[in-house]
Regions:
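Gly/Ser/Thr-enriched, mixed-charge loops and adjacent short helices
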Residues: 1-2, 89-172
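Short secondary-structure boundary/capping elements
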Residues: 2-6, 33, 56-59, 143-146
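Generic, well-ordered alpha-helical scaffold segments in large soluble proteins
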Residues: 9-13, 44, 48, 67, ...
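N-terminal small/polar loop signature for handling phosphorylated ligands or for N-terminal nucleophile
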Residues: 12, 16, 20-88
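Glycine-rich phosphate/diphosphate-binding loops that line cofactor/substrate pockets in enzymes
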Residues: 6-24, 157-166
Length: 173
């Protein structure tokens, strides 16, 4: 319910900004129900006539920011609770500049979310129907490659990296 309510509010705001053709990029992490929440968000947007670009598997939040700009989307959604305990999940919205929403969009979106008081007004559709309509597009390797290429352009000390690239060990916890 919460994901669909938030997404219907976002959809209403996107429509008020004439952004339905630009679309919304959607990413998610490995937390419980992230994939399902991302799919439900996409289908709600699709039912409102808004194109979505949803990653084929989990991606980091910075890649969502990149995808929003690369695909010229009006907005992006990341299903993640970020630094919070793993049993939680969350819903973050980004605007067309790839950054988290700021005024006036933050207030505009929240006003639309709060206005969704009747669940019967929340739209959704079947995934196959959305795909046939060209509203649900799965993205992956092409965006990954473009993202990594852009990251490589930001490397400041390539010589230092080359010196340790075969011996550097990283532990992720």
């Amino acid at each position: 319910y919460t994901v669909r309510q938030a997404t219907q509010g976002l959809a209403n705001y996107v429509l008020s900004q004439n952004g339905q053709e630009k679309g919304v990029a959607i990413a998610y992490d490995s937390r419980r129900m992230s994939t399902e929440f991302a799919t439900e968000a996409a289908l709600c947007l699709n039912a409102n006539g808004i194109k979505t670009y949803i990653f084929d598997s989990l991606r980091p939040t910075p890649e969502l920011s990149f995808a929003v700009r690369e695909l010229h989307c009006i907005a992006g959604i990341v299903i993640t609770a970020s630094h919070n305990p793993r049993e939680y999940n969350g819903y973050k919205v980004y605007w067309e500049d790839g950054a988290q929403i700021t005024p006036p969009h933050d207030k505009g979106i929240m006003d639309e979310v709060k206005a969704v008081t009747d669940f019967a007004t929340v739209k959704t559709m079947e995934k196959e129907e959305a795909k046939k309509a060209g509203l649900y597009e799965v993205i992956g390797a092409a965006i990954d490659d473009a993202y990594i290429a852009e990251l490589k352009k930001l490397v400041v000390h390539q010589d230092a990296i080359n010196q340790v690239k075969d011996t550097l060990k990283i532990v992720y916890t």
